[in-house]
Amino acid sequence: YAAHRASRALAASSSSPPPPPTRSNGTHDFAPTTILISLDGFRADFLHRGLTPALTAFARAGVSPKYMMPSFPSLTFPNHFTLVTGKYPSEHGIVGNNFWDPVRRKQFTYTNASLSNVPEYWNAEPLWETAELQGVRAAIHMWPGSEAHIGRVEPAYVDRFDGREELSNKVHRILGWLDLPGPADPGASNETPRPQLIAVYVPNVDSDGHKYGPNSTHVRSTIAEVDGMLASLLRGIEERNLTDVVNVVVVSDHGMATTSTTRLIQLEDIVDLQEIEHVDGWPLYGLRPFNQSENRLLELYDGLKKQEELHEGNFKVYLRDRDMPVRYHFTNNPRIAPLWIVPEAGWAIAPKSEFDVAAGLRTGKTFAPLGLHGYDNDHPLMRAIFLARGPAFPHPEGSAVEPFYNTAVYGIVCQSLGITPQPNNGTIELPFKTIGTHDPEEYQQPPDDPPIKTAGPSNPLPSTMTTISGEDAATRAGDDKHAAAPENTEPGEEASKGSGDENTTWRQWVDGKLESFRHWVTGIFGDHK
């Protein structure tokens, strides 16, 4: 945190590159302006289902890769902070939706504002602070972390999370900001400035993906509704003659995998929970044993590796400081637990108190959520989107670029605004190096769901593999889903107020599933978790 403060001071004193030129829509002058929209849980292949005419037309007029890769773990809060800092979760500090900080001896829980909207957790300068420190006013609509009061300056506008908000209201909010008078216009005011950076969070696809599954009819409808929202926004921008004046960047944070009761592992069957003090994450598990000596960690690791083999590789086991894949960039931070269980995409792990796998298979009980993420960030089912159009992207229409990681988004948006970014892990410079053009309507085979596992006389599944299709996932989804609904400081705050609060809380957002998850955690690991 102290390093973050120092880096901000350095950035404030450094010189910025000349900003892009002011542009006019015929009646008003606009300084460089960029709208960044995040569609939580919008998997890359959702663009190829014939449900998104607005996004397809937008891609055809702009520039995009076939997909963008999220950062590990592919969860909402870590990735939304990566999108606005350009740093890996291990560097910016938000290493999961839920995690234990052994230095502060406190728990980060994105569903509780008092446990998440603490500036000390957020160890990097977000996009809105970078902008404000360089005189570019920012408006942030429900973006995860935007209510945490990070740094020494606040955005000009911050909208608290409201899970009941209609998509049309998001459009009205964005266009309302664009309609404010600019600095040279009559009626201009420092109290109500026209923002140049607008960042907007849209949780709908992720929320319904968890609840109904990414391949469900309901999610198809939700994808179409979100596309309709973007159609209304783009139409409003065109009506204001701002299509060639304002940059629009549409991204997502991760994809989604379908869960199945045949792809569930009972947590107690692979590890002795009496030895574990804290459990972080989900659907991946970070384990903090009471005894974290090197010898005991190796013993637990060896035992879990045997279980990994027994379960035919349906999950992987890693020691943070020994064999965590380098490409995960998931080491060198005490908030990252020392021992990890990472399921294969579509698999979930559940404690028996939350879902009895054997009983679920016997009775046909369905596990919820029906969709999950948080897996290997390079898995095709976790792929996200990036689409951009505007004066900062002067490429031929329909330009294609090579797929890239979401650490690049922060720097791209900074360049579009003409501001100097903080040091980050992105490497892309504008204009993009394009690789020709592509037709966004060209059909792409969607990634396959994981195969359904069935037990047979010749290859019986271990009892722990009986799966809770999405239920465990569901509660987590609630957890991660909340991710879908940003950990917003406001969500946390509202969660603490109870169901009578005027705004929908994150817990309400996940239909009460988080509450059951909280009881499970408390029951097993105590109130500190």
Residue ranges and their predicted role:
Residues 280-412:
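Active-site neighborhoods of enzymes that stabilize oxyanions during catalysis
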Residues 45-92:
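Short, structured active-site-proximal loop/turn typified by the sulfatase FGly-forming signature C/S-X-P-X-R
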Residues 312-336, 420-452:
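Polar, surface-exposed loop/tail segments
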Residues 3-8, 86-213:
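His/Asp/Glu-rich, glycine-adjacent segments
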Residues 66-84, 141-149, 426-433:
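Short, solvent-exposed turn/loop segments enriched in Gly/Ser/Thr/Pro and often Arg
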Residues 165-172, 182-185, 205-246, 413:
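A long, amphipathic alpha-helix that forms part
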Residues 339, 454-529:
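Phosphate/adenylate-binding glycine loop and adjacent helical scaffold
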Residues 245, 252-291, 449:
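Acidic/histidine-rich catalytic neighborhood
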